[in-house]
A protein has these predicted regions:
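Bacterial N-terminal signal peptides
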Residues: 7-15
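Sec/Tat signal peptide C-region and signal peptidase I cleavage site
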Residues: 16-20
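Short, exposed beta-strand-loop hairpins at the edges of beta-sheets
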Residues: 151-153
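Amphipathic alpha-helical segments
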Residues: 21-136, 140-148, 170
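Positively charged n-region of N-terminal signal peptides that target proteins for export
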Residues: 1-4
Length: 171
């Protein structure tokens, strides 16, 4: 009997503790869109990306032209010349693939530039969210932009504007 009473009290206390926890959410996309430095960084990244995409695309166009030229002239070329042209095409294609990887690979220039420009802003946002969570005694703050399965969120629990204010941006 004592065990049942102790267990009941434990369940009752833990249910009260669970009910006392506060939850809120932010929309990190909304926050970032309202920070001019983030928008400027994103524009710079987009500009670089387009520039690099054009460079890679132009390189592949050169390879394509080399291949078409080779196909048209192959009947006139000696075996030695065919081999040299094939090697030149393969070498050029490898150069372009390496260039593409250099710009857009996992540790590529675009990734590094994004780390340089965007990460400090994201770190500031995260710091502000953590400060608000501590000040407001929130147990959990969700991000609705992260693609989680939040089917409904009451706007009164949205702390996005509070985060922007903490970062010094009026909205």
């Amino acid at each position: 009997m004592k065990k049942i009473v102790v267990l009941s009290v434990f369940v009752l206390l833990t249910s009260f503790a669970a009910m006392a926890q506060k939850y809120a959410f932010v929309d990190s996309d909304y926050i970032r869109k309202n920070i001019p430095a983030f928008n400027a960084a994103q524009e710079q990244l987009d500009k670089l990306s387009k520039q690099w995409e054009k460079e890679v695309s132009d390189g592949y166009a050169v390879v394509e032209q080399m291949y078409k030229s080779y196909q048209n002239e192959s009947v006139l070329l000696s075996q030695d010349m065919k081999t040299k042209r094939e090697e030149a095409i393969v070498t050029k294609e490898k150069e372009i693939k390496d260039l593409q990887n250099k710009y857009f690979g996992v540790e590529g220039e675009l990734f590094k530039k994004r780390e340089e420009l965007v990460k400090p802003i994201q770190d500031e946002i995260l710091k502000a969210i953590k400060e608000i969570a501590v000040e407001g005694s929130y147990a959990v703050i969700f991000d609705t932009a992260a693609g989680g399965n939040i089917l409904f969120a009451n706007p009164k629990y949205d702390l996005s504007d509070q985060v922007l204010q903490k970062l010094g941006y009026k909205n």
